[in-house]
Curated annotation (Swiss-Prot):
The active site is at D29, N77. Gene3D superfamilies: Decaprenyl diphosphate synthase-like. Pfam families: Prenyltransf. The lineage of its organism: Bacteria, Pseudomonadati, Pseudomonadota, Gammaproteobacteria, Enterobacterales. This is Ditrans,polycis-undecaprenyl-diphosphate synthase ((2E,6E)-farnesyl-diphosphate specific). NCBIfam families: uppS. The keyword Cytoplasm does not apply. InterPro entries: UPP_synth-like, UPP_synth-like_CS, UPP_synth-like_sf. Belongs to the UPP synthase family.
Amino acid sequence: MSYSKNNMLFKNVLNFKKNIPSHVAIIMDGNGKWARKRGKSRFFGHFSGFYAARRAISFALFHKLKILTLYAFSSDNWNRSPREIKVLMELFFYALSNETNNLNKYNIRLKVIGNKEKFNTVLKNKIRVVEKETLKNTGLLLNIAANYSGRWEILEAIKKIVVAIKCKNLSLNAITESTVSDFLLINEKIPVDLVIRTGGECRLSNFLVWQISYSELYFTNTLWPDFDRKEFKKAIDEFSNRERRFGRVSH
C-alpha cells in the first residue's frame, strides 16, 4: 500500500492557510490505552500505531512538509516488559523491511536518531541499510527517534564538542548556541515548528529538549491509532491560527 493512497479524498476538504509548518514532530502516545479500550493486547495497539504512522507520513508528503520527526521509542521504554520490548523491536524491523520501497518511491530519506548501540545486531544492520538506501532521496526527511532522549542527545553533543576542543578543531571561546546545534542529531537549520502529542498527556517526555524552545505545542486527547488525516489537519489549523512571536511583542 502506497503512502499516497486515499489522500486525494481530502483534496477538496482541506483548506489550509499559508502558515504551514516545515518541520512537525509527533509524540505518538496512546497505543496501549487504545488497545485496552477494545479489549485487545498492547501489541495490537502498537501494530495499529504503525498504520497511524504511515498515515502521518502520507499527510506530510501530500502537504509538502520538509521534515517529519516521530518519537517511536524512548530510552525510558526499556523499563517495559521484556515481551513488549521484543514485540516493539520486531515491529520496528518489520517496518524497516517493508517500507524501504515506499520510501524510495516517494523520495523520502530515513534517519534514525537515538542510541542505536543497544539494539541487536540484526536491527542495527537493517537501520544502516535503509538509511544508506534512502540517503540520496531529496524529498521529505523522516526522522525516527528510537532509543532516544533529549538529555542524552545534548550529552552526546557536549562530548563531541569536548573532543573537538581537545583536537584543536574548535576554540572554547568560539562556542555559541549555533555550535551546539551543529553537534546535535537534529540541528536547527530547519527548526521544529510544531510538536504534537497524542494520547491526552500534556508533557514532552524528554523529547527534543534543545530544539523545541520556540516550537508551538499541540496536545490532543486523540489516541495515536485514531490520529488520522483529519486530526492532523486540526493540529495544522491550530498552528496556522497562532501568532509566533519569538520574543517579540504581539501585533
